[in-house]
């Protein structure tokens, strides 16, 4: 680090000569810059023991500048001139003024302590003279005048703009009050300890959605909403972000083996209420509808191990009618509802075990698979795929095989028929050829009826 050079005579002659040469060139450079930048006249005459006198810019230039200077009056010439004595006198005056300022500040501080000691009853602790008491009286009057001027200013103009209220509520402080307000929606604070919500006075309706019991989650609040009805039986579910109507999920409670949904996502952009009911299907996932405009009603599905993805672009309700008379129903764990439907979709229980029924993707009419009901032991479809692009309803018939029973004729059943007197069909290997066994009273024969045919050879393979 370069240190500051002391302004003293350099004792070494050689070093002093080198310094002269360097600084002589520097001062001439500075004079050239000064005359060029400021458009002034300047000259320099330098005498030294090391070389002949040096003039700048030239001998003629020096004579011209000196002649012009001597033509000025004496007062004007000495106005900016300063000798060494004058320079020292000016420096002493500046230091004396600075010292007087410090003494005045110290005296004011001493008088202020003296004044507050008198107010506190501590006047006898120190010894004050007559001058001190006089200065105290003057200082007290000056201090009172300043206080009165400040009080008058605050009375006329109030607080300054720099004094603003705190942005956050302080613990124990009263919350602000909003008066004469028609309707204000105040979202609650999530997991903020000690925070105070603003109080709304004279308010027609304030809609505040409740908090959900989700650990560590901050759920978004639906603003500008007429009413919000939120269930309390679901966990880990996302509230609709842009809905304009209440969401009312309905969950059935009359089933014996019911497992509630663990992850249910509500409709994100719906404008009508959505009604959800339990699905009695184990291992199946039905995605929720994302952009529907009509209510969706779901009923329980009795399908074990099957997945029913909903129609993606349908405009009519899909109503598969499946029997619901089954004892062992297990609900879905993850249900994803239809994505873009505009009409309600009604689902009923499917008596199909281990089957996957993908729904129609682009249909415009309902798909109604008809399956017989009222049987205790029946063989169900393994993989039944519904029509992908149909526009008319498709009706499915379910052949059922039982041991030691052969029926004659074609068997067709739907949901609306009376199942009390239905005959159990028997399939002999041909999906389009069914036989009806003769009606024989069991009370008279004591065993199941049996028939033999010449058209079938696979009776021993039809075991349920």
From Swiss-Prot:
Chief site of localization: nucleus
Leader peptide range in chain numbering: none
SMART domains: MADS
Domain MADS-box: 1-60
Low complexity composition bias: residue spans: 451-464
Subcellular location: Nucleus
Gene3D superfamilies in UniProt: Transcription factor, MADS-box
Region described as Disordered: spans on this chain: 443-464
InterPro entries noted in UniProt: MADS-box/MEF2_TF, SRF-like_MADS-box, TF_MADSbox, TF_MADSbox_sf
Subunit record text: Interacts with AGL62.
Cited function: Putative transcription factor.
Name of protein: Agamous-like MADS-box protein AGL92
